[in-house]
Amino acid sequence: MTWLEPQIKSQLQSERKDWEANEVGAFLKKAPERKEQFHTIGDFPVQRTYTAADIADTPLEDIGLPGRYPFTRGPYPTMYRSRTWTMRQIAGFGTGEDTNKRFKYLIAQGQTGISTDFDMPTLMGYDSDHPMSDGEVGREGVAIDTLADMEALLADIDLEKISVSFTINPSAWILLAMYVALGEKRGYDLNKLSGTVQADILKEYMAQKEYIYPIAPSVRIVRDIITYSAKNLKRYNPINISGYHISEAGSSPLQEAAFTLANLITYVNEVTKTGMHVDEFAPRLAFFFVSQGDFFEEVAKFRALRRCYAKIMKERFGARNPESMRLRFHCQTAAATLTKPQYMVNVVRTSLQALSAVLGGAQSLHTNGYDEAFAIPTEDAMKMALRTQQIIAEESGVADVIDPLGGSYYVEALTTEYEKKIFEILEEVEKRGGTIKLIEQGWFQKQIADFAYETALRKQSGQKPVIGVNRFVENEEDVKIEIHPYDNTTAERQISRTRRVRAERDEAKVQAMLDQLVAVAKDESQNLMPLTIELVKAGATMGDIVEKLKGIWGTYRETPVF
C-alpha cells in the first residue's frame, strides 16, 4: 500500500508545475534565490518544497509505527515517553583515580551512563612504561594497564545500576576481560551488567587507523567478544559498530551509514560461521553514529539506517526475533565541526546536532564540550554539554511525542532516498568482493578521502559556511580559554602501579598462561575471552597480552592509497 492513488499523485505534480511557473516564477524576478542549486551536506539535491507526491511511492509499511518492523519511526513503541535517552558524556584522562572523580562529578550533575576514553598507549596495547608510551600516558584519555587500574577507574560505582561504555578497539577484548574480572571480584551477576565495548576494528582500517594486528585475526577477536558475551553477558553490548569515526575522517553522511552497515554484514557473517544463529547474538548489537550539521539530513539518515538494518537482519540473515531487527545507537555531536575561533558558538552547533539526534531516535547521546577543539573538556564545558541534553529532554517537549518529524514530506522523501542509496552502495561492495577485500585495496579509504577533500575545498571557497572561520570572522589575535590541564605526575603514578602489579604477581604462572593463550590463538575454533579473563586476574598487563600475540599474528601495515 502506498500513500496516494496514481491519479492524485498526478494532480499534485501538475499543481506544483503550475505553482513553479506562476507564483515562483513571478517572485524570483523580484527576489532571486540565494544560490542556483541547494544540496544537503551529503550532496542530496534539495527541492524548493515537498508534497505528498514526493513520497507517493513509499510503501506505508516502510514508514509504519514506532517499535514495529521495519522500525523506521523508532526501535521502541513508547520511546522517550517511557524513558529518555541515556545521557552519556565521555570522560577519560590521567589515571583511573583521576577519571573516576570526573565520572562521579558527571553522575552528580545528572548523567545517566558512563563513557570512557583511553589514552593512546592503552588503545594501541602498550603498557605505560613502554618506550612508545613516553609523553602520552593519560594525556588524551585514561591509562589502563592492569586490572588494578580498572578497579580504580570504577571505584564506588555500582555497575548494576549504571551502564559503562568503553571506547576502545584493537585491545578491546582485554578491557572487556578486566571489566568481567572486576564484576566477578565484586560478586555481581554478570548477566545484570549493562554497557558497551566498541570493538569495531574494521572502521579502524577504514578511518581512524588505530589497529594492531592484521585484519583476519582482528575480526576473529571481534567474533570471540560477540560469542562470549552472547552466552555470558546477556545485557551487555559486545560491539558498537561505529560510523562516527568514518564521518570524522571526512566521509559523507551517506558513506557513514552505508560503510557501517557493510561492516555489520561482515561481523554477522563471521559469527554465524561458528554455528550461532543470528537471533542468539543480534539483539545486543549496537551502533555509534555522528550527528552532523545538516539537521533534516541527519534525522533522515537515522530513520533510514533503522529501516535498512531491519531488512538486512530479517531478509539476509533470517532473523525472527524482533529484538534482532531493532537498530539501537549511541550518538555524538560532530567534533569535526567545532571551531577555535569564537569557540562559544560551539554551544549552539552542539545544541542543534543534539536535537537532530533526539528527533532521529538516539538511545544514548554525548554532547561535545565547547572547548574540545582545544583539548580534553573541562568540568565547566562538560556541565554545559550535559545541561544542553537536559534542556532538550525536560523543557523542549520533543521527548513527549514519538518521531514528530515522521510524515514530513521532506523527511520521508529523504529517508527513502537514503535507504535506496545505502543499498546501492552495499550492492557495489558485494560486487567488488566484500568489505575486507575493499579495505585491503583501499577502496573505502579513497572514497572517504575524496569527500573530505571536496569538503575542504568548499570550506576554503566559502561554499560551505563555517561561522567564525569563513563567515562573520573576527580578528582574534590570541584566543583566551581555560583548558584542561595535564598533570605531569600522571606517568609516574601510573607506571608505579603497573610495576607494583608485576612485582607482586606469580611470574611463572603468568608466563605459562601467556603460552596457553598462544595455543588458543592458533586454534580458531577456540575463544580468547576465558583465558584472557584469567590472565588479567593473575596480573598480566595489557602489554603482556598484546605483545605475546604479535609473535604469532604480526602487525598490520596499511598500503597507501593515492
From Swiss-Prot:
Annotated residues for binding of (3S)-3-hydroxybutanoyl-CoA: 76-79, 86-88, 117, 196-198, 235, 240, 245, 284
EC number: 5.4.99.64
Effect of residue 90 to F/Y: Loss of activity
Effect after changing residue 90 to A: 6-fold decrease in catalytic efficiency with 2-hydroxyisobutyryl-CoA as substrate. 320-fold decrease in catalytic efficiency with (S)-3-hydroxybuytryl-CoA as substrate
Effect of residue 117 to V: 1.5-fold increase in catalytic efficiency with 2-hydroxyisobutyryl-CoA as substrate. 3-fold decrease in catalytic efficiency with (S)-3-hydroxybuytryl-CoA as substrate
MF annotations from Gene Ontology: cobalamin binding; methylmalonyl-CoA mutase activity
Superkingdom of origin: Bacteria
Consequence of gene disruption: Insertion mutant cannot grow on 2-hydroxyisobutyric acid (2-HIBA).
Alphabetically ordered keywords of this record: Isomerase
Temperature dependence: Optimum temperature is 30 degrees Celsius.
Site location (Important for the stereospecificity of catalysis): 117
Impact when changing residue 117 to A: 2-fold increase in catalytic efficiency with 2-hydroxyisobutyryl-CoA as substrate. Small increase in catalytic efficiency with (S)-3-hydroxybuytryl-CoA as substrate
Catalytic activity: 2-hydroxyisobutanoyl-CoA = (3S)-3-hydroxybutanoyl-CoA
pH dependence (record): Optimum pH is 6.6.
Assembly: Homotetramer composed of two large substrate-binding subunits (HcmA) and two small cobalamin-binding subunits (HcmB).
Role played: Together with HcmB, catalyzes the isomerization of 2-hydroxyisobutyryl-CoA and 3-hydroxybutyryl-CoA. Is specific for 2-hydroxyisobutyryl-CoA and (S)-3-hydroxybutyryl-CoA, and shows only very low activity with (R)-3-hydroxybutyryl-CoA, isobutyryl-CoA and butyryl-CoA. In vitro, can isomerize pivalyl-CoA and isovaleryl-CoA, with much lower efficiency. Plays a central role in the degradation of substrates bearing a tert-butyl moiety, such as the fuel oxygenate methyl tert-butyl ether (MTBE) and its metabolites.
Family the entry assigns: Belongs to the acyl-CoA mutase large subunit family.
Name of the featured protein: 2-hydroxyisobutanoyl-CoA mutase large subunit
Organism listed in the record: Aquincola tertiaricarbonis
